[in-house]
Amino acid sequence: MASRSLNGDSDIVKPRKIALVTGITGQDGSYLTEFLLEKGYEVHGLIRRSSNFNTQRLNHIYVDPHNVNKALMKLHYGDLSDASSLRRWLDVIKPDEVYNLAAQSHVAVSFEIPDYTADVVATGALRLLEAVRSHNIDNGRAIKYYQAGSSEMFGSTPPPQSETTPFHPRSPYAASKCAAHWYTVNYREAYGLYACNGILFNHESPRRGENFVTRKITRALGRIKVGLQTKLFLGNIQASRDWGFAGDYVEAMWLMLQQEKPDDYVVATEESHTVKEFLDVSFGYVGLNWKDHVEIDKRYFRPTEVDNLKGDASKAKEMLGWKPKVGFEKLVKMMVDEDLELAKREKVLADAGYMDAQQQP
């Protein structure tokens, strides 16, 4: 849209880019939304209907939609299991970029609900890709598509793992992510879709779900420190992972869609640490010995374990100019600080009689 300036020159007002984000209420979705808003985007997110509000990770950036000039993040009901809703929202929103972050993303849970995991993670990605393809054809558009992959796809393949490393998935979740990865490659090759796979290694933050091991540790640690909890039960503490900061990784997602040609990229810190090392750093940071509080529970071991994941992100560094900013110890301490403050607030409630002092989070 053009406007005339006082000196007679025509000033071109560049329209805002529009992004559609599935999984917007999750850890990655919230950080990506913040990042895109800072870049001047209008961001739309698909959320599933829930009996309880599940948008707490977005509350700090939420603006009442009645304030149309400032509400640049908008939420809509949709689901990767419902193809009609995906196509409908593409037609209504007309996004420039689609980021598919939605998933049943817990590895252990995927063994309990494998059908659902495959339907949402694998077939859900296929539904969204097909919706993008048909929307592009019918409307003469060229949406760019990002598919969230996972280092779990590599499974038992020895590290370091790069874009050329063979996949060997060891869970229904990982197998479903492999399917989504290849659907994305197929739509890129068959239909010329600008579609990228981001193979992200483990990335954490204070917004990480509490049933993931890193947040489970820091959440329990905060409560132990203030006297609300005494024990933490864990599974395989020798498992080694390449842990980075989620806030760093969303930048890599965006960069993939800003290139001349679509491609697939590994995103990782290129450092690997065991769960035991995470315990050492986190408990040591607050002056505690984890051995006094942690017990190993065989129930938390998976039917097939993934022992060591360590990424080779040289391609992302060279082609995207991306590199992680937050190191392992800084990440751990960031998470401990946040969860210690949360535990202190819980302690106030417990002391006032509003919650059971030993109530687990």
Curated annotation (Swiss-Prot):
PANTHER family, per database record: GDP-MANNOSE 4,6 DEHYDRATASE 1, GDP-MANNOSE 4,6-DEHYDRATASE
Catalytic activity reported: GDP-alpha-D-mannose = GDP-4-dehydro-alpha-D-rhamnose + H2O
Role according to the record: Catalyzes the conversion of GDP-D-mannose to GDP-4-dehydro-6-deoxy-D-mannose.
InterPro entries from the UniProt entry: GDP_Man_deHydtase, NAD(P)-bd_dom, NAD(P)-bd_dom_sf
Enzyme class, first EC level, given as a word: lyase
Recorded family membership: Belongs to the NAD(P)-dependent epimerase/dehydratase family. GDP-mannose 4,6-dehydratase subfamily.
HAMAP family in alphabetical order: GDP_Man_dehydratase
Keyword annotations: Lyase, NADP
GO MF annotation terms: GDP-mannose 4,6-dehydratase activity
Protein name per UniProt: GDP-mannose 4,6 dehydratase 1
E.C. numbers: 4.2.1.47
GO cellular component: plastid
Species, as recorded: Arabidopsis thaliana (Mouse-ear cress)
Tissues in which the UniProt entry reports expression: Expressed in roots,stipules and pollen just before anthesis. Primarily localized to the root meristem and columella root cap. Not expressed in emerging lateral roots.
Residues where NADP(+) binds: 23-28, 79-80, 101-105, 116, 177, 203, 208
Active site per database record: 150, 152, 173
One Pfam family from the record: GDP_Man_Dehyd
Cofactor(s) demanded: NADP(+)
Matching NCBIfam families: gmd
Gene3D superfamilies xrefs: NAD(P)-binding Rossmann-like Domain, UDP-galactose 4-epimerase, domain 1
Subunit composition and interactions: Homotetramer.
Pathway(s) annotated for this protein in UniProt: Nucleotide-sugar biosynthesis; GDP-L-fucose biosynthesis via de novo pathway; GDP-L-fucose from GDP-alpha-D-mannose: step 1/2
GO biological process: 'de novo' GDP-L-fucose biosynthetic process
